[in-house]
Structures are given as C-alpha cells and as structure tokens.
Amino acid sequence: MAENQYYGTGRRKSSAARVFIKPGNGKIVINQRSLEQYFGRETARMVVRQPLELVDMVEKLDLYITVKGGGISGQAGAIRHGITRALIEYDESLRGELRKAGFVTRDARQVERKKVGLRKARRRPQFSKR
C-alpha cells in the first residue's frame, strides 16, 4: 500500500480490528465494504466516527479496516480503539484529547462465564420455599 500510512490495532470483547490510515478525503472501507454497507445500525456508525469527529479529521483521512470476531457492537468498539491508536501514531499531539474522551483505554470487560447449577452467569433457578 502507500508509504505514508499509519496503523493501529483495536480490540473489544472478542473482536479485533486492524486499522490503516492515510491522507485522503474521508473514505472508510471495512472488510472491502463501505461503512454504511457494513454497519446497518446508525449507533455503530457513530461509534466508528467518534474519534475522527473529535479531532476534526473526518474529511482528511482515508481508512482501510479489517475486523474479525464478535458482534456488531464489539466490532464497532474494536474499530474505534484501532482508529484511536492509528491517529496517535499519525499525530502524537492528539493523545491528550483522545484520552480525555476515553478512546485510548481498552475496554477490558468480557462476558462472564456460565456457572454450573445456575441458568446463566448469575441467574439462579427459581427458589421454592414449599
């Protein structure tokens, strides 16, 4: 690809995203599809655009993204994390702004495992006194 591109890896839940940024006109490609084609939900699209809107670079950069694993929400979060890391590699002075917005920190929350004797991770079977 281009010689002046910047890379960031993002993770969220069980999703992992690889984000490549290069100067351009605001084109976002996710797994060979446009942002609108890939994410049907508007909330997921908003999550992906958040770091770019914060630093006002929506129209200045082209993004090429590959993402695997998880669902829509996890993938959107992973892409946001990856974009943030790539932006920091692109311009270190953006770190403070992105940190303040909470985009730099990896969201470490994972699904809690189901326990034996319970219906879900914490949901117990109904208790009958008599």
Curated annotation (Swiss-Prot):
Query: Can you quote a single GO CC term?
Result: cytosolic small ribosomal subunit
Q: Which family does it belong to?
A: Belongs to the universal ribosomal protein uS9 family.
GO BP term (any one): translation
Keyword Metal-binding in the entry? The reply is no
Against NCBIfam families, the record matches this protein to: PRK00132.1 (NF001099)
Domain of life (superkingdom):
Bacteria
Q: Which UniProt keywords apply?
A: Ribonucleoprotein, Ribosomal protein
Q: Which GO terms describe its molecular function?
A: RNA binding; structural constituent of ribosome
Q: What is this protein called?
A: Small ribosomal subunit protein uS9
Family matches, as SUPFAM superfamilies: Ribosomal protein S5 domain 2-like (SSF54211)
Gene that encodes it: rpsI
